């Protein structure tokens, strides 16, 4: 969440910046609202729904969905809608590329590569 100087509260800082350009789609409420009111706001409901990859038609069949996430703000900026619909969207392509590489490293089971991966993952 991000609080603007005027007391309005948004789902994220990018949503706050978008509001400064006149679009308040990500506004949860204001500092005058209770936490419960903010969490039950239409914006909170919409963002939570749009963030659930298991419910998105383009994502629910994707092999990477358990390891992935979507950002409704990015989707809204690129597609004009909160719901992710394009598997060619840059964040999706990048995530698939990274995950494909990580799974390839795991599959090869090269000890040197696995040690680098373990250090990177901090395990």
PLM features per residue range, with description:
Residues 15-63:
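C-terminal accessory region of radical SAM enzymes
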């Amino acid at each position: 969440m991000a609080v603007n100087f005027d007391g309005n509260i948004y789902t994220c800082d990018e949503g706050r910046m978008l509001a400064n350009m006149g679009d308040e789609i990500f506004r949860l409420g204001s500092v005058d609202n209770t936490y419960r009111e903010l969490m039950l706001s239409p914006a909170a409901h919409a963002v939570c729904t749009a963030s659930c990859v298991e419910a998105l038609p383009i994502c629910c069949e994707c092999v990477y969905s358990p390891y992935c996430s979507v950002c409704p703000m990015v989707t809204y900026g690129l597609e004009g809608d909160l719901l992710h619909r394009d598997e060619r969207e840059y964040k999706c392509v990048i995530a698939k590329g990274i995950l494909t590489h990580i799974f390839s490293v795991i599959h090869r089971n090269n000890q040197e590569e696995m040690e680098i991966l373990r250090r990177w993952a901090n395990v």
